[in-house]
UniProtKB/Swiss-Prot annotation:
The keyword Protease does not apply. Gene3D superfamilies: 3.30.300.20. Belongs to the RbfA family. This is Ribosome-binding factor A. GO terms for molecular function: ribosomal small subunit binding. It comes from the Bacteria. It is found in: Cytoplasm. SUPFAM superfamilies: Ribosome-binding factor A, RbfA. GO terms for cellular component: cytosol.
């Protein structure tokens, strides 16, 4: 008897993802990765999503102050095996050390687009007319 698959991550996947995110952040903050691109860039890790078997960790990163994110993400993926090895001391409780993959985090861009839409004259006009009708 199998359990139906769900698209939502389990509590364990969320907890392990947060632990992996914190461990990757520590590795990058300590400057353990010797790469000119990575050392010169401030990198924000917004989320780490784990596969259901906890063997693959996909880290969503945003390089700050860099116009071309792909260069930084390629550098991180080149050093993914080294970073995976450095996660060991912080994630001793895990049976398998997850393979780390880095992806560009586009959620900040989506938030920016939504904010621009909400501040557009058309939407603000509609919001003003709704508040005027509520007052009557």
């Amino acid at each position: 008897m199998t359990r139906p698959t769900s698209s939502a991550p389990s509590q364990r996947m969320l907890r392990v993802g947060e632990q992996v995110r914190a461990a990757i952040t520590q590795v990058l903050q300590r400057g353990e990765v010797r790469d000119d691109i990575i050392e010169a860039t401030v990198i924000s890790i917004s989320e780490v999503r784990m596969s259901p078997d906890l063997k693959i960790a996909t880290a969503y990163v945003t390089p700050l102050g860099v116009s071309d994110h792909s260069i930084v993400i390629e550098a991180l993926n080149r050093h993914a095996k080294f970073i995976r090895g450095r996660l060991g001391p912080q994630l001793r409780q895990m049976k398998y050390m997850p393979e780390v993959r880095f992806r560009d985090d586009t959620s900040f861009d989506n938030y920016k687009k939504i904010d621009e839409l909400l501040r557009s004259p058309e939407v603000s006009r509609d919001l003003d007319s709704d508040s005027d009708s509520d007052e009557k």
